[in-house]
Amino acid sequence: MEQANHIHTIVITGGPCAGKTTAMSWLQNALTDAGYAVMFIPETCTDLNNSGVTARASKTNFDFQRVQVKYQLLREQVYRQAAEASASKEVVIVCDRGSMDDKPYMTAEEFAAILKELGQNEVAFRDKYDAVFHMVTAAKGAEAFYTTDNNTARVETLEEAIELDAKTLAAWAGHPHLRIIDNSTDFNGKLVRLLREVMTALGKPAPFEHARRFLIDMPDRAWLENHPACRRVEIIQTYLTDVQGEKRRICMRGSDGSYIYYMTTHCTGTDGSRIETEKRLSLDDYQQLMMEADPMCMPIRKTRYCLMDDAHAFEVDFYPAWQDKAMLQVELNDPEADVHIPENFRVKREVTDDPDYQNYAMARIR
């Protein structure tokens, strides 16, 4: 039986004048050189507007947004079929914005109504993509380069661009592989950082992501719940028995009764670097793999708050047995990168290198 193609679906999103158009060209060349077949789904809103389908020409904004969401999903389905039929075994579908990018243009009630009409829940709707990369608008950190001259559809002022950037990022909050590409370097450096993050997400042999972890005083849950750029998810991680030296764990992740399932594998590359790969599981696959659970480990249950703050996506983990503390984590490709802890968190100490606070150690039965 012929082996199925390995298909990755990623989203490039961001605020106005963030550099997405140039980034698409960079990714096309770099991913092709790396041996991938690359398929680009153009921005749905622009495609519709250029075809005469606009919000202004629709009866209501909600009518237009509903059409746009349905068109986005249809194109993703068609491109997925094309990827499955590709002669290449490694295919990357790159979406110029994804389905959650429409959320800032609707009320919460309108967005919920569209999900209900489509028979979708927000967790699956958001997390169906393998990774999401948010390119920050030039209006935030590279103001001298912000312009509306290169896009007739762009009319936002600096302040409006920053506000829209924040709303777009908030719409994606909670995705397990959301990365923020800010303007901390020049534009060429921004593109290099994007490419590095994309290659890491695709599982190319690359240095293992560095997670910095901090023990913090018990934070205010109400503040997290009400933060516009924060989402709560429930997580159960189960470690499996090793296979050929590879450490494996499966994860159930979601909220409000809607869950998705993953398996993560850690191994060592030929150069000694640690490599992490991840794949989505069906519920049946997840339940079957539960039979391979390591009998020396307990499942780890935690409530996670995914908080978007400036250049980083922070994760705040609450464990049932902890009454006076929580874990704050941020993942970095560059271990030397500066991390500015949000002022609402009081750090007890950093535990990045403390083996007692690694997930595997916490799961071990003692």
Feature map (PLM): residue ranges:
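NTP-dependent small-molecule kinase module
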Residues: 2-4, 160, 166-218
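The conserved Walker
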Residues: 16
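Conserved lysine of the Walker
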Residues: 20
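Hydrophobic positions on the alpha1 helix immediately C-terminal to the Walker A/P-loop
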Residues: 23
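Conserved substrate/cofactor phosphate-moiety recognition/catalytic segment
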Residues: 28-71
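Conserved nucleotide-sensing/catalytic segment adjacent to the nucleotide-binding pocket
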Residues: 53-113
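A glycine- and Lys/Arg-enriched "phosphate-lid" helix/loop adjacent to the NTP-binding pocket
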Residues: 105, 109-170
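Phosphate-end processing signature that detects enzymes handling 5′-triphosphorylated RNA
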Residues: 188-189, 195-366
